[in-house]
UniProtKB/Swiss-Prot annotation:
Its main location: cytoplasm. It is found in: Cytoplasm. It comes from the Bacteria. The keyword DNA damage does not apply. GO terms for molecular function: ATP binding; histidine-tRNA ligase activity. SUPFAM superfamilies: Class II aaRS ABD-related, Class II aaRS and biotin synthetases. HAMAP family: His_tRNA_synth. Belongs to the class-II aminoacyl-tRNA synthetase family. Keywords: Aminoacyl-tRNA synthetase, ATP-binding, Cytoplasm, Ligase, Nucleotide-binding, Protein biosynthesis. This is Histidine--tRNA ligase. CDD domains: HisRS-like_core, HisRS_anticodon. GO terms for biological process: histidyl-tRNA aminoacylation. Disulfide bonds: none annotated.
Length: 424
């Protein structure tokens, strides 16, 4: 017997029993961005490695440790995309979508990072994101946060997520703070762990995000970024907070929130949950006004966010919010005997034509009544339609309830669609 091939570690199959919750989530995402007038953009899975080195930053964990990178047959270095923002900017620059224009875009698709697989985090994962270009004001920052809040409301998880905000200032403000932070860290180098010492000069703001308890205790006395921000940055952030309060979105200001990607400036945010253990972030984003220019375009203000769908699916399952999702089948059609099979097929087709949203499965492969009812029950359908010799002769269909303790009913063939529509 040939050796069975397994999926690559960290790259998981989504099986038919798991698909309904994914489909529900994807439907909510599409409906919500549509309600805000956003347009979909689809970019390639494989991009030039240089795109991510220039956008994410060469000294980030993603570029240093996590990217799937290879040389193609022409010797070009290519990478499976680890996130969606850089590809969206590249496409916008390449096709002239961004300069002197406003664009509200969204994307959804697989991303790849070679990190340690754990619950809710995989090497291939699915990411949904929104990106807005050409609007510098705080009202668009508020809009993307309002959009994300609407997602939680539609998914029924508003009470289980909280919003954390911070502002990183512009490049000059951040540079001044960076120098002050390095000077502070140099005085306490003996307290820093190996990872923080490595980041101290290459990306010191990431030290603020350290999970080491001793480092966090030290940072309580570190210079505060807020002390290095100018009036314009403070005004932008203050206006954002006022808008969120006006629409009833609660938030917490977290001065340690810096985000793991180099391109962020001013507003940064995360939606977090305590329902998934230590890995609590379910959505993150912020403003990245310099990235379009950094990747060869004209300077363009931008803001956006991304979320990993596996994390949201896990949260929905943890909260048992996947229990009410409708099964893949509403009605299962059976035929008792060879002479009834053609009529059963016609009944199923007529129902699909009359009720486009109805999910109808026809039994195939023959079998006795017991076998067909077993298949009907396994399908998850609410009812089975039974067509036997008597039903065929009387132009009727028997409706057998699979999830309720109700007696079987006979329904006239020409009234069946109306009956089923009221039923399901």
């Amino acid at each position: 017997m040939a050796k069975q091939i397994q999926a690559i570690r960290g790259m998981n199959d989504i099986l038919p029993t798991q698909s309904p919750i994914w489909q529900k989530l994807e439907t909510v995402l599409r409906e919500t961005v549509s309600a805000y007038g956003y347009s979909e953009i689809r970019t390639p899975i494989v991009e030039s490695t240089d795109l991510f080195k220039r956008s994410i930053g060469e000294v980030t964990d993603i570029v240093e440790k996590e990217m799937y990178t290879f040389d193609d047959r022409n010797g070009d270095s290519l990478t499976l995309r680890p996130e969606g923002t850089a590809s969206t900017v590249r496409a916008g620059n390449e096709h002239g979508l961004l300069y002197n224009q406003e664009q509200r875009l969204w994307y959804m698709g697989p991303m790849f990072r070679h990190e340690r697989p754990q619950k809710g985090r995989y090497r291939q994962f699915h990411q949904f994101g929104v990106e807005v270009y050409g609007i510098p004001s705080a009202d668009i920052d508020a809009e993307v946060l309002m959009l994300s809040a609407m997602l939680w409301e539609k998914l029924g998880i508003t009470e289980h997520v909280t919003l954390e905000l911070n502002t990183l200032g512009d490049s000059e403000e951040r540079a001044a703070y960076r120098d002050a932070l390095i000077a502070f860290l140099e005085q306490h180098k003996d307290v820093l762990d190996e990872d923080s010492q490595r980041r101290m000069y290459s990306n010191p703001l990431r030290v603020l995000d350290s999970k080491n308890a001793a480092v966090q205790a030290l940072l309580a006395d570190a210079p505060a970024l807020m002390d290095y921000l100018g009036e314009e940055t403070r005004s932008h952030f203050s206006h954002l907070c006022e808008l969120l309060e006006a629409v009833g979105i609660q938030y917490t200001i977290n001065p340690r929130l810096v985000r793991g990607l180099d391109y962020y400036n001013r507003t940064v945010f995360e939606w977090v949950t305590s329902s998934l253990g230590s890995q609590g972030t379910v959505l993150a984003g912020g403003r990245y006004d310099g990235l379009v220019g950094q990747l060869g375009g004209k300077s363009t203000p931008a803001v956006g966010f991304a979320m990993g769908l596996e994390r949201i699916v896990l949260l929905l399952q943890t909260l048992e919010l996947d229990k009410d999702i409708k099964p893949a089948v509403d009605v299962y059609v059976t035929a008792m005997g060879d002479s009834c099979r053609v009529e059963a097929i016609k009944v199923a087709q007529d129902l699909r034509a009359s009720l486009p949203n109805l999910k109808v499965m026809s039994h195939c492969g023959g079998g006795n009544f017991k076998k067909q009812m077993k298949r009907a029950d396994k399908s998850g359908a609410a009812v089975a339609l039974v067509i036997g010799e008597d039903e065929l002769a009387n132009n009727q269909v028997a409706v057998k309830y699979l999830r309720e303790d109700k007696a079987q009913e006979l329904v006239a063939r020409d009234a069946l669609a109306t009956y089923i529509a009221e039923l399901v």
